[in-house]
Amino acid sequence: MTTLSPENSLSARQSASFILVKRKPPIDKTEWDSFFDESGHLAKSRDFICVNILERGLHPFVRTEAWKFLTGYFSWQSSQDERLTVDSMRRKNYKALCQMYEKIQPLLENLHRNFTETRNNIARDIQKIYDKDPLGNVLIDKKRLEKILLLSYVCNTQAEYQQGFHEMMMLFQLMVEHDHETFWLFQFFLQKTEHSCVINIGVAKNLDMLSTLITFLDPVFAEHLKGKGAGAVQSLFPWFCFCFQRAFKSFDDVWRLWEVLLTGKPCRNFQVLVAYSMLQMVREQVLQESMGGDDILLACNNLIDLDADELISAACVVYAELIQKDVPQTLKDFFL
């Protein structure tokens, strides 16, 4: 067991306070540009920028460019000229992947049953997406989205297609202009978040660590969840598979949380602290009504239209509480 530094706890509490008080507005284009010198090299530290993103967020006009740094699409050490070269390379690589896919598609159709099944699943999922805004304007191109999802499935050997990827990819398509940007940002997002939303890689680990965290911080609640509420925590896998996007009131709230996850602030695997904070929202009701697993799951599924800043702030407070304690090595290794 290791006690973590109180300075980290103070920093996390300060971040939580900054988020709610909103002492400064989100980082806008003028401020973002001030982070770089004339050649496009970073003039501020990466840590400084990431802490500001945690505490303040990004203005929508900045998000596209900032996410390219946060995901690793661009190196933080690159110049403007180097970034132009990298973007051109990523465009060419995407085009080459598309050409490769067109060549091997007949082979995949004939030899791999999983390919045909997955392609049909993607097509069905795409049709479920509501692609218009309240005024009836078309938001996304479903054909382009389907193509990118298929290519992602064929090229990504680690993260097979799963339900939820279509909604996640849609948010990337809404953020950027070009298909190669959508494709690469999604791949880098999965890598940067340690595949935490992928069922066969990160989701089970998240659920196990969520149970461990509840046991450590809230033994009374943990006892109920292990008894009458058995199975409830393991049933929360959609939170991680969809990266919480169905819990928020707007796309901006989803992007706000995701960009915090990308900063790695205030810690790694922040998504588990977010899930813990959401469970705390139903805790009193669960205990007072002595809910069973199905009712707990229903109460959790009713957590919608959440405010991202409030949830991020609550999770920062949980982290501050956690690191003041004698933390088990498993939790320390997971969050640090």
From Swiss-Prot:
The record marks 163 as: Glutamine finger. Keywords: Cytoplasm, Cytoplasmic vesicle, Cytoskeleton, Differentiation, GTPase activation, Spermatogenesis. The keyword Acyltransferase does not apply. InterPro entries: Rab-GAP-TBC_dom, Rab-GAP_TBC_sf. GO terms for biological process: flagellated sperm motility; plasma membrane to endosome transport; sperm axoneme assembly; sperm mitochondrial sheath assembly; spermatogenesis. GO terms for cellular component: acrosomal vesicle; cytoplasmic vesicle; cytoskeleton; extracellular exosome; sperm midpiece. Its main location: cytoplasm. The record marks 124 as: Arginine finger. One of its GO terms (molecular function) is GTPase activator activity. Transmembrane segments: none annotated. Residues 57-265 form the Rab-GAP TBC domain. Expressed in round and elongated spermatids (at protein level). Expressed specifically in adult testis and very weakly in fetal brain. It is found in: Cytoplasmic vesicle, Secretory vesicle, Acrosome; Cytoplasm, Cytoskeleton. The arginine and glutamine fingers are critical for the GTPase-activating mechanism, they pull out Rab's 'switch 2' glutamine and insert in Rab's active site. Acts as a GTPase-activating protein for Rab family protein(s). Essential for the establishment of male fertility, and is required for both the production of normal sperm number and sperm function. Plays an important role in the formation of intact mitochondria, outer dense fibers and axoneme within the sperm tail. Essential for sperm mitochondrial sheath formation and for the interactions of ARMC12 with VDAC2 and VDAC3. May be involved in acrosome formation and cytoskeletal reorganization during spermiogenesis, possibly by regulating RAB3A activity. Interacts with ACTB. Interacts with ARMC12, TOMM20, DNAH7 and RAP1A. Interacts with RAB10. This is TBC1 domain family member 21.
